[in-house]
Curated annotation (Swiss-Prot):
Its main location: Golgi. Belongs to the STOP family. Interacts with calmodulin. May have microtubule-stabilizing activity. This is MAP6 domain-containing protein 1. The keyword Disulfide bond does not apply. Expressed in brain. Found in neurons in primary cultures, but absent in glial cells. It comes from Mus musculus. The modification Phosphoserine is found at residues 38, 41, 160.
Length: 191
């Protein structure tokens, strides 16, 4: 008989290569590195650094899949490590690039309500494949049992324990299977 899979690590290792970006809860970011998906030749990189509008057009034309975090909370982030996205930001009033200082717009994502197909699309594969373990025993009660305290005197707290110390009396009863002999003999009635 095989041991049960306790930690589910074997399941994670088996499906690790099947993960897509929506299964990662927190968007992963690489600071200071170029995007691995946008590997270009050295000449193109120098042109894109010099002219941010051309690189921005290339970036916006490519479809970027949203992560589960972005789907749930509507967060739109710039690509990790792209220097062009940082250069395209407006630099405020009187900026060096002469761009207009428009206030940044905030987008709010509203979760779909009532559509069953949209709810299935919004969940990840692990949420769809979840099954509760069967055959698990319920845990024992953690309720503490009441302890009985035997006191030897009724005065309560005594500041001098040596003077009033009494050894608790220990009574041992021998087991007696017959209940008849445990009581005194009945007295005869005088009529």
């Amino acid at each position: 008989m095989a041991w049960p899979c306790i930690s589910r690590l074997c399941c994670l290792a088996r499906r690790w290569n099947q993960l897509d970006r929506s299964d990662v809860a927190v968007p992963l970011t690489l600071h200071g590195y170029s995007d691995p998906g946008s590997e270009e030749s050295g000449a193109d990189c120098s042109v894109s650094r010099g002219n941010p509008s051309v690189a921005g057009a290339r970036e916006s034309s490519r479809a970027v899949p949203l992560t589960q975090y972005q789907r749930d909370f509507g967060v739109r982030t710039a690509r990790a490590g792209s220097r062009d996205a940082a250069q395209e930001r407006p630099s405020g009033p009187g900026g060096r690039r002469g761009q207009s200082s428009a206030p940044p717009t905030r987008t709010v994502y509203v979760l779909p309500v009532g559509d069953a197909d949209a709810a299935v699309v919004a969940t990840t594969s692990y949420r769809q494949e979840f099954q509760a373990w069967t055959g698990v025993k319920p845990s024992r009660s953690t309720k503490a049992r009441t302890a009985r305290v035997v006191t030897t005197h009724s005065s309560g707290w005594d500041p001098s324990p040596g003077a009033s110390f009494q050894v608790p009396e220990v009574r041992k009863f021998t087991p007696n299977p017959s209940a008849i002999f445990q009581t005194s003999a009945p007295q005869t009635l005088n009529v």
